[in-house]
């Protein structure tokens, strides 16, 4: 029995428990119902994770990433924790009249949407596991875990209904919001099944859960914004104003349009390719597929039309641009040409020199790949830290453009679109690690997103000056120093099977605190609001460092979000 109880307590779970407890203890009375729902979600995710890891054959038809734990608990609580921390921050803003109720209500809806996605996936996993009860190898305790986890997720749904009814004006309003949450849940279940089947062995269940909930939330916001524009006279005014009535910046609309447009493009191209091949078969029954050259031409023409005509049309529709969005981007860049063009030139030179240098090292040297990849983390610090201090609005747009380029290149690589597909595949393989696969290379995406998301989420009111730096500090400084020091000087390991060392973790935590000590007076001199205590910062940095030490999940994705959520408190 002791062995079983000990196996339930892992380093990653303890850190997640500390993070969730820190968030719950920071909640004002107005967010108690949200905190109760987060507690229920955490409990259900914990039980589902135990159930999966004690009987891994239950989800054997999902080919998750090898060598990683399921990560269900961490994956389920990360995005809701970020949203509830943002609610805590907005509650402080409203108390000093620095934010409006509409913004708080908008983030509240986003919290429940993200939570509903995670809750639905947990219910889906519980249902799958409960269907394997006929197997004689299942113990009574395993069945009990399944029942309790399913009960917890149902109670979570009840808490969601009660909370939404309290902030709604009418029963119809509550019903519409519950339907909206149900839509997010169903979409999340459908999407996670698609991701795990289409990209086998590319992600753990927890990583897939985080990606799924994030994509569903982003697409849901896109869809609601569009529907509100089309049916603003038909949809009740209170629903539109509460859910999606906040002011949207031009940069936010452009980034959202670019990224979602590129994510939707593969479906569009499949449809176009199907029509083209059908027309070929009508002309010649012996010709089944188009040639590679024709496919490449069709791909680039479709991509150009979709991104230059279709996507900007949506941007202009939802935001009323007075010119083409790409022309707006040029106007924005040249509004401060010396600063922004100089920054672009600096980035280009740094990228060219670094990539060519590291690529040659990877081919001719015996430098371990993990250390080589950490050099890119340092490069991210050199690129993004000065820009975030000096040109934060321009950096928002630059992150969106860089991610759009990465998504487009990954689509070309996966489909081997001539003439770039095969060279891209060979080049990318030089920088992959055990978390990448032939199907999908995620390292560059996760690093860029890990740095970008805290910056994007810090737009608007922000009384925690260090929160936009969460990704840069945790990945560029903390994770890099932990890996390099641990690799060269580490002796004491946190676990017998893991590679993370006590020395590396200590170096990561110390380096992050040191950079914070340097950043704080610089930000204060530039007029940033500084209201975070040093003890709170120490807790956030320490918890982040311990999560990096214990987690087997994709740290580039989880660590910045956890650090950001703790910094917002």
From Swiss-Prot:
Lumenal topology ranges: 44-67, 130-147, 200-207, 274-296, 362-369, 415-440, 486-508
Catalysed reaction, written as an equation: a di-trans,poly-cis-dolichol + CTP = a di-trans,poly-cis-dolichyl phosphate + CDP + H(+)
Gene encoding the protein: EVN
Source organism, top-level taxon: Eukaryota
Region annotated CTP-binding, chain positions: 487-503
Provenance organism: Arabidopsis thaliana (Mouse-ear cress)
Cytoplasmic-side segments: 1-22, 89-108, 169-178, 229-252, 318-340, 391-393, 462-464, 530-548
Annotated disulfide bonds: none
Protein name: Dolichol kinase EVAN
Family according to the record: Belongs to the polyprenol kinase family.
Keywords, in A-Z order: Endoplasmic reticulum, Glycoprotein, Kinase, Membrane, Transferase, Transmembrane, Transmembrane helix
GO MF annotations in UniProt: dolichol kinase activity
GO biological process: pollen development; pollen tube reception; protein glycosylation
Glycosylation sites: 289
Bilayer topology term: Multi-pass membrane protein
Protein role: Essential for pollen development. Involved in protein N-glycosylation in the endoplasmic reticulum (ER), especially in the female gametophyte. Mediates pollen tube (PT) reception in synergids through protein glycosylation.
Deletion phenotype: Pollen tube (PT) overgrowth inside the female gametophyte (FG) without PT rupture. Degenerated pollen grains before maturation, during the early tricellular stage.
Transmembrane regions: 23-43, 68-88, 109-129, 148-168, 179-199, 208-228, 253-273, 297-317, 341-361, 370-390, 394-414, 441-461, 465-485, 509-529, 549-569
Location of this chain's protein in the cell: Endoplasmic reticulum membrane
Listed GO CC annotations: endoplasmic reticulum; endoplasmic reticulum membrane
Enzyme Commission no: 2.7.1.108
């Amino acid at each position: 029995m002791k062995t079983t109880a000990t196996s339930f307590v892992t380093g990653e779970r303890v850190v997640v428990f500390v993070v969730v407890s820190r968030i719950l203890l920071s909640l004002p009375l107005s967010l108690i119902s949200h905190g109760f729902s987060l507690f229920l979600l955490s409990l259900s995710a914990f039980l589902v994770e135990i159930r999966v890891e004690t009987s891994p054959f239950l989800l054997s038809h999902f080919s998750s990433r090898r060598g990683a734990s399921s990560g269900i608990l961490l994956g389920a609580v990360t995005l809701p924790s970020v949203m509830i921390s943002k609610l805590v921050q907005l509650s402080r803003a409203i108390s000093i009249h620095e934010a409006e109720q509409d913004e708080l209500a908008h983030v509240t809806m986003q919290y429940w949407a993200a939570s509903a996605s995670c809750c639905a996936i947990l219910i889906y996993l519980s249902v799958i596991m409960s269907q394997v009860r006929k197997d004689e190898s299942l113990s009574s305790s395993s069945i009990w875990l399944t029942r309790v986890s399913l009960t917890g997720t149902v109670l979570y749904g009840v808490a969601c209904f009660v909370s939404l009814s309290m902030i709604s004006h009418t029963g119809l309003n509550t019903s519409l919001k519950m339907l909206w949450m149900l839509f997010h849940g169903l979409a999340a279940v459908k999407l996670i099944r698609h991701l795990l089947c289409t990209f086998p062995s590319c992600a753990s269940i927890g990583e897939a859960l985080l990606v799924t909930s994030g994509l569903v939330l982003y697409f849901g916001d896109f869809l609601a914004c569009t529907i509100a524009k089309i049916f603003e006279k038909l949809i009740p005014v209170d629903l539109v104003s509460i859910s999606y009535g906040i002011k949207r910046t031009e940069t936010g609309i452009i980034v959202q349009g670019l990224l979602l447009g590129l994510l939707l493009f593969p479906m569009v191209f499949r449809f176009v390719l199907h029509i083209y091949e059908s027309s070929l078969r009508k002309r010649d029954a012996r010709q089944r597929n188009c040639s590679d050259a024709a496919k490449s031409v069709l791909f680039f023409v479709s991509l150009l039309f979709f991104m230059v005509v279709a996507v900007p049309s949506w941007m202009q529709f939802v935001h009323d641009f007075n010119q083409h969005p790409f022309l707006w981007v040029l106007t924005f860049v040249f509004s401060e040409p010396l600063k922004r063009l100089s920054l672009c030139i600096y980035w280009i030179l740094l990228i060219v020199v670094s990539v060519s240098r590291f690529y040659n090292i990877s081919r001719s040297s015996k430098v371990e790949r993990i250390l080589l990849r950490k050099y890119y983390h340092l490069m991210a610090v050199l690129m993004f830290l000065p820009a975030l201090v000096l040109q934060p609005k321009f950096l928002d747009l630059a992150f969106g453009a860089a991610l759009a380029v990465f998504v487009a290149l990954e689509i070309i690589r996966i489909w081997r679109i001539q003439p770039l597909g095969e060279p891209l595949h060979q080049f990318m393989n030089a920088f992959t690690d055990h978390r990448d696969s032939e199907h999908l290379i995620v390292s560059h995406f996760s690093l860029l997103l890990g740095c970008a998301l805290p910056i994007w989420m810090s737009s608007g009111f922000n009384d925690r000056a260090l929160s936009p730096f969460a990704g840069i500090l945790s990945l560029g400084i903390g994770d890099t120093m932990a890996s390099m020091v641990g690799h060269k000087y580490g002796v004491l390991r946190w676990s017998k099977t893991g590679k993370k060392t006590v020395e590396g973790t200590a170096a990561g935590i110390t380096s992050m605190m040191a950079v914070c000590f340097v950043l704080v007076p610089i930000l204060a001199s530039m007029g940033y609001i500084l209201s975070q205590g040093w003890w709170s910062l120490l807790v956030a940095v320490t918890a982040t460092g311990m999560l990096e030490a214990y987690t087997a999940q994709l740290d580039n994705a989880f660590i910045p979000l956890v650090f950001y959520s703790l910094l917002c408190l």
